[in-house]
Amino acid sequence: MMENWPKKPEGSQWTDDQWKAVVANGRDILVAAAAGSGKTAVLVERIIKKIINEENPVDVDRLLVVTFTNAAAQEMKNRIGEALEKVLIDEPGSQHIRKQLSLLNKASISTIHSFCLQVIRGYYYMLDVDPRFRIANQTENELLKEEVLDDILEEEYGIEDNTIFFELVDRYTSDRSDDDLQRMILALHTESRAHPNPEKWLDKLVEAYDVEGKTIEDLVYASYLLEDVKFQLETAEQHIRKATELAMLPDGPAPRVETLQADLALLGTLSSAARESWTSVYEAMQNVSWQTLKRIKKSDYNEDIVKQVDSLRNKAKDEVKKLQEELFSRKPESFLRDFQDMHPVLEKLVQLVKVFTERFQAMKRDKGMVDFTDLEHFCLQILSEQSENGEMKPSAVALQYRNKFAEVLVDEYQDTNFVQESIIKFVTKDSESEGNLFMVGDVKQSIYRFRLAEPGLFLGKYKRFTQEGLGGGMKIDLAKNFRSRHEVLAGTNFIFKQIMGEEVGEIDYDADAELKLGASYPEGEDVAAELLCIQQTEEEVIDGEEGAEVEKAQLEARLMAQRIKAMVDSGYEVYDRKTDSMRPVQYRDFVILLRSMPWAPQIMEELKLQGIPVYADLATGYFEATEVNIMMNVFRVIDNPMQDIPLAAVLRSPIVGLNDEELATLRAHGKKGSFYEVMSSFLKGAPLEEEKELHDKLEWFYNLLQGWREFARQQSLSDLIWKVYGETGYYDFVGGLPAGKQRQANLRVLYDRARQYEATSFRGLFRFLRFIERILERGDDMGTARALGEQEDVVRIMTIHKSKGLEFPVVFVAGLGRRFNTQDLMKRFLLHKDFGFGSQFIDPRKRIKYTTLSQLAIKRKMKMELIAEEMRVLYVALTRAKEKLILIGTVKDANKEMEKWLDAREHSEWLLPDHIRAGASCYLDWIAPSLYRHRDSEILLELGQGSIPDEIYGYDTSWKVEVVDGNTLLAPEPVQEEKQELLEALREKKAVPLQSERKEEVYDRLMWKYGYEEATSHRAKQSVTEIKRNYQSEEGSDNAFIKKLRAPIQTRPRFMEKKGLTYAERGTAVHAVMQHVDLKKPITEEVIREQIAGMVNKELLTFEQAEEIAIEKVISFFDSDLGKRVLAAKSVEREVPFTMMLAAEEAYQDWQGKSGESILVQGVIDCMIEEEDGITLIDFKTDTIAGKFPGGFDQAKPILEERYKVQLSLYAKALEKSLQHPVKEKCLYFFDGNHVVKIEE
């Protein structure tokens, strides 16, 4: 095949593998692109090569390019556009390239959801959806789900003899609420939607519990758990073998070898049984009997070795004991009874999920909205149809897309899910060996399993495809990294060669997967990767787990602050690729990566204390902000003033300003009843002299509260919020506090959030507050408003997920000692794509519950997937660094942890034993054992090479491994003597003398006045419309006159207002029609209607705007004398933009500045016609006239002439300047009444 592909050009910078990825053709291709390997450049080059191919060029709109984010899609379009423009410079006459540039904007280069949207918009008639549907936001979606689920459960509770439902409720809800049941239904709904056929997946889930006529060996759960049994028995055998080796050492307890050999025989028997069947293992486990260790005189042997032997044997026995208790304490048939008992309950649960899905879809359909999963499923529904055997096959639409797309290219393929894979499959060729699917990704960077991404899709193809592409698809490995120094790459490889394998990690980190150096850097100092392990002594640990976490965050933050400050102050150098030289490091070159953001606030605070600018896009802390908390309490009180805690919080806040004594005084006036009732009662009576101030405060607030409550019933939530801000003065108040801009930004975010909420189909303060409470219950806080831009010279703190795709010269990866988040494994029920549903067996009558086989299998499977995912997350973190990688973790007892980690030194293989890798509870449990097998750890360990092979011990990588004493980090820093004196003076509020040589310069700058003050009060650039308004004084304008003539009409309440377009939107729509109406065709209703429909298709008008166009008024214009002149004109120009310079005094009546100043004026002329005797200017107006003037149009005419005279005069002046011909006539045409007004000077 390779001979038929273009050869790599001489002097090309592409590697052989990159070039292969650019030009390979004729089959499905999977490119495994390692971090920093230039995959985007390869993808763009492949597209360009296809477009400019001389023999078989492909139009860019015949390629489907699927990206992971909208930003990536836009970047891809930009890169393709730039590349095409470069080609055009070399081939300026190429019409083909010019065509591609014009096609680029409508090319299918987008996210999968955007492509789905495109398919649905084109074939909406095949679905039961309104073509004008909108994408629901998360807020609305959550509220709808809650509403639908409440209705369904309420109906179920009302059905008599609903035995199975109440059995389900008894098993999976608490006495207080049915929240757990609701969570189960929603979780099953969400998981099912990640599959191409949700109902089929749900049905399989129920079928798995139908065990009639089956044995335990028939269950998929038992088969999987048997593999786990083998794994644990193998781990136990390794412990015994290690113990035997130690016992046979010269100082070892040799008499115990015989017992250890018996242990090995016992474990061998169990392993043999595990290879046979579940029943065999069960029977073997009932006969387990460990021999008693022979007594020895410990003083005759090395005490440490004896302890190690005994410890290893106990570990082995614990492994077996754990299996006995979890899996083999019950007879096999008892597990089957669990499934039989749970089957009808699970069937009912799935039925509820199906009903929920159906009702939820119906409600969204009624509201004309869809969510992102709907986009995928609707698209799949259009692209597929059912075959005779019930399987999905491509529909006629799918076949059309197959014919259209010459190739489908998928970026970040490792993050694809099952539904997306099906969509891609239906628009590409069936055969992999002759396919047209090009996939790029790195499964080692697949870190979105929580979003239901399925890395197994990538892995399956990677194992199936070959490098030659024989008999199927082709795989290409891009292993060269063009981002990082050798030290970063070698350090990453050294760790991952030891921890990532197929059994534990899902990926074999072999020679093809290793990162290879592709970048060239100048020699650098101090570029070795580092592991800093902080020892947190018992004395330092604050009480409680939460306190310990805070302490760890503080220790790591302080260490990072010290290192950053030292590197900046010392002029540590990094390479600048733009200037091809080394330069001093800046704060923006540093990033601190965290697995999640709970530590970020403490790290930010510590860095700020050290004077280091820092930025983090926090997704938490918003509702904890004092100003937001106070405002939320205000709104809770407006909704229901009987709530004591929110009301007390508001009364105590700066809004009302009661102190503790005043609050107590109020409460003393009524010990019974709510605070609100007591306050109402207090205000009805006459206050005592000493209570008058309290009375005044409360009366002020009470009156405001009544007004707000009334306002909330009639007006919008967002208007209410701004009204509260204004009437309390609280928005201005927080602006004067420290970090005032940030606080005001937070309050604006609350207002914006309310407006977003109101854009949904929900309304009202109560629903809004309930939604916020739901957010807080789920722990989904929002981040505080941004007050610092991302482009500032600051140290950035971000999650590892956020850093994906980014690179930084210096990377700190912190929190490596934090435990993995295994909370999902502890839930009362578990869900898995392959194994379905698993929960405890619960018998509410006997009040017993225990673990089931399905729960154990799913838990084990999920744990192994979690371990694999965490490995990939660590890989992403380490590969963000360009020049310097610093890993930091904190441990409670370094000696104890090191003892555990040093077990790895006893193994001679590159890949650490499965039990070490699978047993990790944090990243340090992988990193430290790996590094402790390298020579650079010997300074710390002083243990020597031992039995570690040379290729591991002497691997070509540089590391600095150090244990840092936490006490040294917490010691206070000394304060310089002069700074101490200054601080003392400030504390005593003494004046501090100004000792600066620039006092005069500072004074001059502060007192300086701008020489063009007048110009600052007027814009240098104006539109014609703004100039027109400037000429209309407030009292003398026609607007004021019209207001006087209008009949007194009261504003219609909002709930009675008709929804529709605004006047401005209607006017824009009419102008658009007048701009695009075809003057060569007959002006009839049918023709105009057809043209309007065409404008909607071209997205020049919306459906709503099209419906509002009064076609008869358009026709009336062309039937008028002026309209006939337009049709008969020599030439007609419409929507003519212009820009001209105008004397400032002409534009501004109040101008008092220098004469000769000019301003830039811009505008758009609706229509100009050229006739034999000159140019006529026409301006279309959609003003409402009928009913506004008692004297009819005769009264309106002089007012309208005056209103638009300046505007048309400027238009005429602009035309005369540009065309060098006089304008003979200026006309206004009013659609309301078919009136023409000629403007005379």
UniProtKB/Swiss-Prot annotation:
Give GO cellular component annotations, separated by semicolons.
Answer: cytosol; DNA helicase complex
Q: Where does ATP bind?
A: 33-40
Task: Give its E.C. classification number.
Answer: 3.1.-.-, 5.6.2.4
Q: Which SUPFAM superfamilies match?
A: P-loop containing nucleoside triphosphate hydrolases, Restriction endonuclease-like
Query: Where does the UvrD-like helicase C-terminal domain lie?
Result: 505-805
**Has keyword Magnesium?**
no
| Keywords, comma-separated and alphabetical | ATP-binding, DNA damage, DNA repair, DNA-binding, Exonuclease, Helicase, Hydrolase, Isomerase, Nuclease, Nucleotide-binding
Q: Which Gene3D superfamilies match?
A: 3.90.320.10, 6.10.250.2380, P-loop containing nucleotide triphosphate hydrolases
Positions of the UvrD-like helicase ATP-binding domain: 12-485
The reaction(s) annotated as catalysed by this protein in its Swiss-Prot or TrEMBL entry are:
Couples ATP hydrolysis with the unwinding of duplex DNA by translocating in the 3'-5' direction; ATP + H2O = ADP + phosphate + H(+)
What is the required cofactor set for this protein?
A: Mg(2+)
Q: Which GO terms describe its biological process?
A: double-strand break repair via homologous recombination
* UniProt GO MF annotations: 3'-5' DNA helicase activity; 3'-5' exonuclease activity; ATP binding; ATP hydrolysis activity; double-stranded DNA binding
Q: Which HAMAP family match?
A: AddA (MF_01451)
Q: Which PANTHER family match?
A: ATP-DEPENDENT HELICASE_NUCLEASE SUBUNIT A, UVRD / RECB / PCRA DNA HELICASE FAMILY MEMBER
Tell me its family: Belongs to the helicase family. AddA subfamily.
Q: How does it assemble?
A: Heterodimer of AddA and AddB/RexB.
Q: What function is annotated for this protein?
A: The heterodimer acts as both an ATP-dependent DNA helicase and an ATP-dependent, dual-direction single-stranded exonuclease. Recognizes the chi site generating a DNA molecule suitable for the initiation of homologous recombination. The AddA nuclease domain is required for chi fragment generation; this subunit has the helicase and 3' -> 5' nuclease activities.
Q: What is this protein called?
A: ATP-dependent helicase/nuclease subunit A
Q: Which organism is it from?
A: Bacillus cereus (strain ATCC 10987 / NRS 248)
Which gene underlies this protein?
addA
